[in-house]
Amino acid sequence: MKFLLSNDDGYFAPGLAMLAQTLQRYGEVVVVAPERDRSGASNSLTLDRPLTVRKAANGFHYVNGTPTDCVHLAVTGFLDFRPNMIFTGINHGPNMGDDTLYSGTVAAATEGFMLGIPSVAVSLAGHSGKHFASAGKVVEQLVERCLEEPFQQPVLLNVNVPDAPPEEVGALQVTRLGRRHAAQPVIKSQNPRGETIYWVGPVGAVQDAGAGTDFGCVASKQVSVTPLMLDLTAYGQLDRISTWLHR
């Protein structure tokens, strides 16, 4: 198999190194990742300047752009082959519920899916960063399952792995996205010149972590696998909005 890898933590991130190390056992691996941390970049593309691709000492390619730039550039012009699968991550921190809308890791996988390639975003759902090997084991399971029964059409999967030793990580479970409460207010401060500055505040507390959610799954030390889709249409509101417009 031929794999394209990317992330949003930057080409130097330990999670990306673990992902590459894991997938090299199964085929050809090419890494095209941002030159710096682009967490929270979501699906943004760089349109106001050209992009450059450079090669690091470890063989990874890095781009002066967003995670979505990396995958788009790689698939549509940089690579001389079409990847069989795209993996993004292993993200240092969870990407669950509403987080998926902001995540560059999920966005990079989404770009691959939009280009017709099965794509998987993988995150280590904790901030200690101690157990990337556990996420690597999960990637192995997913690839081996794909080898046994390949996807017949492109899929987009969001995978969150508990930040725990491999022996403590439970089975893979198919989940839906949970929800958070609204984010906390921005943090207002001053720089040394006395100018007012703002930092984006912490994420909101978990609101929906019930049965079947990604939050609930990871809290029980199981692996959350959430199939994602791109259609944002609120079908349940079509009739109501139509009535409102034409009343």
UniProtKB/Swiss-Prot annotation:
Its EC number is 3.1.3.5. Disulfide bonds: none annotated. It is an enzyme of class 3 (hydrolase). It is found in: Cytoplasm. A divalent metal cation binds at residues 8-9, 39, 91. Its cofactor is a divalent metal cation. Binds 1 divalent metal cation per subunit. Nucleotidase that shows phosphatase activity on nucleoside 5'-monophosphates. Belongs to the SurE nucleotidase family. PANTHER family: 5'-NUCLEOTIDASE SURE, 5'_3'-NUCLEOTIDASE SURE. This is 5'-nucleotidase SurE.
